[in-house]
Structures are given as C-alpha cells and as structure tokens.
Amino acid sequence: MYDAPRPAHLRAFVPISGAEHTAVSTPGDLLFHIRATRLDLCLDLCFELCHQLLRSLNGLVQPVDEVHGFRYWDERDLLGFVDGTESPRSDREASAVALVGAEDPAYAGGSYVIVQKYLHDLEAWERLSVAEQEQIVGREKLSDVELPDAAKASNSHVAATTIIDPDGTARQIVRDNMPFGTAAAGEFGTYFIGYTADPGVIERMLHRMFVGEPTGNTDRILDFSTAVTGCLFFAPPADFLARPSPTPPAAITDEEPTGHPTTAPPPTRAPIAEAPTGKPLAVIRTDSLGIGSLNRSSKS
C-alpha cells in the first residue's frame, strides 16, 4: 500500500508458546481503532466512521474480526479489576513511551500497536474468593491498590507484566484495553490494545506471561483468560500518507531487522492460528505488507 521502507520493528507477530498457554498469531494488514469517551458518540459517530471506512475499502479488504468494547464501571475489566492502572496518564508521559523518536526518523511520531482478543471463563473465575482473585491479579479488587511485594505471588498478573531493565528503569506502555461481551452468547473478554515505541517491551511481557521467567512461572490469569487473536501493527503519524516515498518496500519477516535488536527474548514459536470466524487466514503474499489478508486483486 505504501512504497517506503517499513518501520524498523514492523514484522509479523510471532506466536509465543509455553507449556500450557499460547499467545497465538492471527495476522492482519489493517487495524482501525475507533473510540469515543461518550456512549452516544460511540453509537453514532464511531459506527458511521466504521461504515464509511469499509465502504471506501469495498473489494480491497476482507474484515476478519470486529469487536465493540465499552467502559465498564470505573474502567474495570469483566473480571472486576481496574484495567490499565499503570498506563501513563498525561500526554507527555504517554508520548515518551509510545511514540517512535530519532531512532527511526522516517517514522518519528508513529507508534507500534499489539492487539490481542482474550476470552474469559467467568464461571470459573467467579467461583474463586475475592482473596484468591487478588492473589492472581496482584491488586486489591475494590481499592485497586497493588499488593505488597511480600504478599504478591511471583506468578500474579502484575508481577508478570512488570518489566525492569538491568539499569533499574521500569518499562511502560500505553494501554487502551476494552472489555467486551454478549450475555446471550455467553462470550466475555478483554481486547488488549498496547501502544509502544518498541514492540519488544510488550513481547517481553507476553513471554513472561505465557512462557514464564523462570520458565514455567506463567501468569495465573491465563488459567481463566485465553488469547484467540494476536497481531502487530504500526500506527503512522498523521502526515504519513502525504510524504513522497520512492523506495520499494522491504519484505516482512518474523526476524528483527539488523541494527534494531528487540528488547524481548526470542519467543517460542507456535502454529499460526485461524481467524476468530474459523476461516483460515489468507496466505502471506509478497506484493502486500506480507502480514495478513489484504486483497490486492483490486487496483486503486
């Protein structure tokens, strides 16, 4: 779609497989994250924008998943805990961790985004006591206060997703997760959306969750939440499409480009999963971005 060299860390999302749980890969070419802070705007403007986008892309893409999220109480997930507590709150803090900088000047101001759709076993979760749930998450349920280190399990969700560099720097990402669900169908989940200047940060979080550090010390929340999708995208700066780009695009591979090492350990590979609809995903083609199901048979 765009004939410039790809962003330094843009590649197919590599599945991460542990002994019991797998972060699956379900590649796609385009992600539209449409959000509003008011319900009436979600129902009106967000729907209309989505409708117009798909009309403009008619025949060029095949939608493989659509999720309608919502705000649940005081920004809680359907497990009952506040979600995104550690996400940066100010624009300045968010920009510092989410936006690409001088390390990749052609894409400065853009951001990588990893998305995963998790389905929850709420029946099993709700059979636990609040104290058991708090040990799994690593926070008090009502107050959202993090448990003291002495009381926090090493395989709690908070412990698994805390990334500390060797120099003591805590690595953050911008989370914009959405709870979703349909009571009639009995489907309840969390749509994880993580923005970062370096996808290796999220990949290391996922490695700690699904494989464990040390190996086997996996995130207990995965006993109740199953990842059914997983994909890595790049969100370009607003003026991206207006820029001239005479250079042919580079092919997408699963490997990190030379000169841009990731901060994550090498993930354990697992088979590429099918789309949530049960239909197999399109074969990767060399004439597209190479990471999904974009239909290039139509010319624009």
Model-found features: residue ranges?
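Long, histidine/aromatic-enriched segments associated with O2/redox biology
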Residues: 1-272, 276-292, 296
